[in-house]
Curated annotation (Swiss-Prot):
Its main location: membrane. InterPro entries: Glyco_trans_51, Lysozyme-like_dom_sf, PBP_transglycosylase, Pep_trsgly. The keyword Membrane applies. This is Biosynthetic peptidoglycan transglycosylase. The gene is mtgA. It comes from Rhizobium leguminosarum bv. trifolii (strain WSM2304). Signal peptide: none annotated. Keywords: Cell inner membrane, Cell membrane, Cell shape, Cell wall biogenesis/degradation, Glycosyltransferase, Membrane, Peptidoglycan synthesis, Transferase, Transmembrane, Transmembrane helix.
Length: 233
């Protein structure tokens, strides 16, 4: 009898573990529908980490209409030029990324804005194949459920732009002492090119390399045209 009771006890523990894992897997997909609501202001896993570690952070939510269009253009041209045309994942870019990895070559990031948004909202920051495998379906779901405008609004309000600096309003105030609505084309391009590594790339105090990259993105943003129609139609 004791062995039988232990068996049933072990099964109950296992069942609880399985249910907990399933809940963790399902929760992000449920939250995506919740984030459709415009008055919901999501936070990122990095923000939650900072709160747990008692670091605090600066994030001031702004609507997409309160963000200078030049910033949106610059970010799209820097991070995801095909944003308006793919369904969350740029499969052509992903295929090239896999091919480069199999050849042992240095790889590009390959992450679209929906992929980065899914990672920032639900996953951890360090790179791994496990994280990427979880990121892909989350990105497709996020892009399917949210409008392109809402998705961009969330992304720009949770992206990290420096230690403890999250969202474009806090970034604009921190680096340039202006609201996000007043960013110039050069300031916008500097903020855009700092996104891949905001801890080491300081948009407010750019080095020569960062200024050169910003110049390239600034020119691309000026000719963005059809690439941004899903945001500004």
């Amino acid at each position: 009898m004791p062995a039988r009771r232990q068996w049933f006890g072990d099964r109950r523990v296992l069942k609880r573990i399985v249910l907990a894992v399933l809940a963790l897997v399902i929760l992000p997909y449920a939250l995506i529908f919740f984030y459709v609501l415009p008055f919901i202001h999501p936070v990122s896993t990095l923000m939650l980490r900072d709160l747990v570690l008692l670091r605090g952070y600066d994030r001031r939510w702004v609507s997409l209409d309160e963000i200078a269009p030049v910033l949106v253009q610059s970010v799209m041209m820097s991070e995801d030029g095909q944003y308006c045309f793919h369904g969350g994942v740029d499969w052509a870019e992903m295929r090239m990324l896999v091919e480069d990895t199999l050849k042992g070559q240095a790889t590009r990031g390959g992450s679209t804005i929906p992929m980065q948004t899914a990672k920032n909202l639900f996953l951890w920051n360090s790179r791994s194949f496990v994280r990427k495998a979880m990121e892909l379906p989350l990105a497709v779901s996020t892009d399917f459920v949210l409008s392109k405008r809402r998705l961009m609004e969330i992304y720009l309000n949770i992206a990290e732009w420096g230690p403890g600096i999250y969202g474009i309003e806090a970034a604009a105030q921190h680096h340039f002492k202006v609201p996000a609505s007043k960013l110039t084309r050069r300031q916008a391009s500097l903020l855009a090119v700092s996104l891949p590594n905001p801890i080491d790339r300081n948009a407010g105090k750019p080095g020569r390399g960062l200024r050169r990259l910003a110049g390239v993105i600034e020119r691309r943003a000026q000719g963005s045209g059809d690439y941004i129609k899903c945001i500004y139609e």
